[in-house]
């Protein structure tokens, strides 16, 4: 017989539900269902507050709910469809399709709350994941099965970079991607679906959205829905999966809204006291096992460009690589606007990427760092006051800066330039030649938005 309770209080997205006795109280994280006309509203148990009552977070709008309504305990957490039937489809936090097509019939279902893999299941070898994006592969390479943060303020190109990564991984590696849209613009989700359908990448991708207009409960759990789908591809099919989360900050933001509604004391800057725990529960499930891997790329919105804010700061501690997008670089018209000095990776290590790659990357960074130091002198005294050695460093640094730019396939319709995928070997060779001074005679404009070093030479010849 179904375990039934009654709604006794509704405060925004938070409901209190009273059951008959303590024995019939649903477990924490159980899904409860309320029938409202022909719709079902699902809520998740968050607290036992005494007096046979549980406090729950609704996963959809609570409009139309009234006290006294019947609530049925499903007996388990929210479960979502997984497997091949989810590819090419768009789902919400509950695993219900929102693309107007019928629900997957035979897809197995898994609960969104699951333990992280055990220690003895983890894979410990480090391997680089080639992205075909020069600045990323050279200076902050991605670890296969690692966690990567894309940091940047509003409008510096986080979403475009994510779309290019999905495109490159699907086309070059044939890998499966899962995209979790967490609290971002619905329009962007729609654009992403359209672009992926056009480029044919959609058949290798499952999309899950809990966008800005949805209640905090949905935004807080939608990352787990996407992660559960990715885990199935890793564990059951042995796939190397890419999990995109856009935006992980909204996950924290939704948690902070829910926390306040649940009556918890806020901690620093008004965030939830359980911030580190919630982030850890999500991040520890994203890992490589002996069966397959989940490589996660997470866009991290940085409130007011402040990297010390608790939300981005908590995210930092989980990451293997960080790609920092800079407004200063985008203002120079260099895209992707990745900051070559702020972006780092744990695997930029000669024992993993090789001695040549490591030395070229460090050489590029040291020249750019010296150029940064000289900029004040140039601004005050001008280029003529520099020594010949410093003039050469500035000239090479400006070429390197421009050679770090690249045309993206997903931006082709806006720029008119065809996108380029540059293998790591070509990237390292190109920058090595610039460092060695082989292209000191070329104008710096030849290096902007080209792929390989040969493209730059051809562009220079064409403009002469």
UniProtKB/Swiss-Prot annotation:
GO molecular function, one term: ATP hydrolysis activity
Residues that bind ATP: 152-159
Major place of residence: membrane
Cell inner membrane is among the record's keywords: no
Cellular localization per UniProt: Cell membrane
Entry GO terms, CC: plasma membrane; proton-transporting ATP synthase complex
Lipid bilayer topology: Peripheral membrane protein
Enzyme Commission numbers on file: 7.1.2.2
Catalytic activity from the UniProt record: ATP + H2O + 4 H(+)(in) = ADP + phosphate + 5 H(+)(out)
InterPro entries: AAA+_ATPase, ATP-synt_VA_C, ATP_synth_F1_bsu, ATPase_a/bsu_AS, ATPase_alpha/beta_chains, ATPase_F1/V1/A1_a/bsu_N, ATPase_F1/V1/A1_a/bsu_N_sf, ATPase_F1/V1/A1_a/bsu_nucl-bd
Highest taxon, organism lineage: Bacteria
Entries under SUPFAM superfamilies matching the protein: C-terminal domain of alpha and beta subunits of F1 ATP synthase, N-terminal domain of alpha and beta subunits of F1 ATP synthase, P-loop containing nucleoside triphosphate hydrolases
Function noted in UniProt: Produces ATP from ADP in the presence of a proton gradient across the membrane. The catalytic sites are hosted primarily by the beta subunits.
Protein name, UniProt field: ATP synthase subunit beta
Organism: Clostridioides difficile (strain 630) (Peptoclostridium difficile)
